[in-house]
Amino acid sequence: MSATGGAKSFTPPDIAKAKGKAPIVCLTAYTTPIARLLDPHCDVVLVGDSVGMVMHGLPSTLGVTLDMMIMHGKAVRRGLERALMVVDMPFGSYEEGPEQAFRNAARVMAETGCAAVKLEGGESMAETIRFLTGRGIPVMAHVGLTPQAVNAFGGYQVQGRGEDGDRVMRDAQAVAKAGAFSVVLEKVPEPLARRITKEIPIPTIGIGASPACDGQVLVVDDMLGMFTDFRPKFVKRYAELAEAAEAGIAAYAKDVRQRRFPAPEHVFSDMPKPVKGGEAA
């Protein structure tokens, strides 16, 4: 897919129709400036609950609240024109049952202006996905490693190795049958991701999965080198912005301490500035 050439925003049906075609480009965003940078290049922009770790300093995504997601969703919405905006449903906002999920997802959509929500889980979430999609809320699913279940998994291990691959396959099939328009496959063996992509009718979006997936997603702070606490194996760094920022900050601090900033060109005189017509500014 391509988010260039035309002003029309992508919709969930557009993404669903991309199955088997040009790869879907997806990145996360949490702020208006980053959303503006992503919009010309991305088909999908995900307001991920990873915001809790990369922007709020939380140790996991479990402490992210619905209000946090809505706040960041509003900011991202202001920066998008073309890309489809999807907002993560945070831990505790949908697991209780379909009614709770609908109530909170409807609030997220109404207050952020997003076009879809994403929730984690496979067979266990099929009923909820069916309930939401049947009431006008498009759902992007998420199977494999689901970070909100990190305590149940005992860590961030690869999911679906050996016989466990059948479980991940069933999860992917279940969310597709329930009506999800796409599914994120996170941290699963490459052959399994390839097989799931071939066998289910909805687009797969990989993160630590396979180049054969119908699309790819990364956390923008990871791929731009802004989040440096740790670096997952599946992340490719396309820039090193933290290093550049640190160098700029150090240069600024040095100039201030040596009274080289502000320089004459950065300050104002007490004389009126001439303008056209001889009038003073």
Curated annotation (Swiss-Prot):
Recorded metabolic or biological pathway in which this protein acts: Cofactor biosynthesis; (R)-pantothenate biosynthesis; (R)-pantoate from 3-methyl-2-oxobutanoate: step 1/2
Residues at the active site: E186
Residues the record lists as binding 3-methyl-2-oxobutanoate: D49, S50, D88, K118
Family annotation (CDD domains): KPHMT-like
Gene3D superfamilies reported for this sequence: Phosphoenolpyruvate-binding domains
Record keyword Lipoprotein present: no
Gene Ontology biological-process annotations: pantothenate biosynthetic process
NCBIfam families for this protein: panB (TIGR00222), PRK00311.1 (NF001452)
Quaternary data: Homodecamer; pentamer of dimers.
Name of the protein described by the UniProt record: 3-methyl-2-oxobutanoate hydroxymethyltransferase
Taxonomic source organism: Chelativorans sp. (strain BNC1)
Gene for this chain: panB
